[in-house]
Amino acid sequence: MKALEIGNVKITSGFWKEYQELILKKVIPYQWDILNDKVKGIEKSHAIDNFRIAAGISNDKFYGEAYQDSDLYKWLEAVGNALQVENNIELEKKADEVIDLLEGAQEEDGYLNTYFQLVEPEKKWSNILECHELYCAGHLIEAAIAYYKGTGKDKILKIACKLADCINEKFGPEEWKMHGYPGHQELELALVKLYDLTNENKYLKLAEYFIDMRGTNQFFEEEFIKRKRICHWTKCKVEEPNRRYNQFPYQEYNQFHQPVRMQKKATGHAVRAVYMYTAMADLAYHNGDKELLDSCKSLWDNITNKQIYINGSIGSTPSGEAFTKDYDLPNDTNYSETCAALGTVSYTHLTLPTIRL
């Protein structure tokens, strides 16, 4: 049993209709203004301008973080979903213009990440743990799927597939490839969705590889040593000789402390966790993998019975935006990141039929 597509459901009144209208009429246009730095009093985004630079249209300098591209991709996904609900010529035109920028910025081999293209091109694929290359790719894929479903236009889908193929050439079990997995999970669930749309088995196999490899080697520690123990997020990017990515708390934070089939308790960064659990459950559904499904069920039981607030939020501590221990759900210091709540909704929406109790 799979969920209905957005375009196959029409909400006509009530609570959810009001929120749907709010998103369509107010939120998405406001986000467009933020992405174009038209909202006064807040830090600039520069996300769209970064793509203009990468496409050779602007001579400006990159601004933002290594994950800056994902903000634009998430907006494009929202537009794609909105266009499945109702037509909006103006919104579609804006999105098409952005997609043209993505096409112009993408490299010949499919690589697309404005931070590394513009700031540190020599360091591509050198910091998978911290720098969100694979995370951003996942959000582009999800945006492409939503936009294709909303418009029938396949330009962004071709861009996303080209990037996915680039990643597939870089990661995998073959001896000459990198034997790693995303630092911030997201790509895994996106690849399963891409398989569902294209029926290209290589995308399902790549998602399966990332899930199966997680927690089976010391990939993140090995790449950290290759970088001479320099952390991307440390001020001035200085050497951190005492940091060990093969020890607590870093393994738990990124959910590579155990192979995924052995994980029974939700731990670490809550957003990373539920994104990974979503991919696990979807893979279990596609492959008939009972062992993986049993792990998903145990994780679901742990979250819903012992690590979730009454309002459905998760990730109680601001330290690491993370799960802590069972029943540690304080009200006064509750963090419960919005992304974690959205991840829980996605996890539930996509996978509850698979792990039905």
Regions of interest found by a model, annotated:
Residues 1-71, 92, 96-116:
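Low-complexity, Ser/Thr/Pro/Gly-enriched N-terminal "stalk/linker" regions
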Residues 32, 76, 92-106, 138-141, ...:
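Hydrophobic core segments within long, regular secondary-structure runs in both alpha-
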Residues 43, 104-113, 155-156, 202-203, ...:
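Proline-centered turn/helix-capping motifs that create local helix->coil transitions or kinks
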Residues 54-72, 123-136, 169-184, 231-250, ...:
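Solvent-exposed loop and edge beta-strand segments that line ligand/cofactor-binding
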Residues 86, 106, 171, 198, ...:
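Alpha-helical junction/boundary sensor with strong preference for TPR arrays
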Residues 130-197:
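A conserved hydrophobic secondary-structure block that centers on an alpha-helix together
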Residues 185, 189-220, 231:
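Solenoidal tandem-repeat scaffolds enriched in leucines and small polar residues
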Residues 348-354:
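Conserved small/polar residues in nucleotide/adenosyl-binding loops
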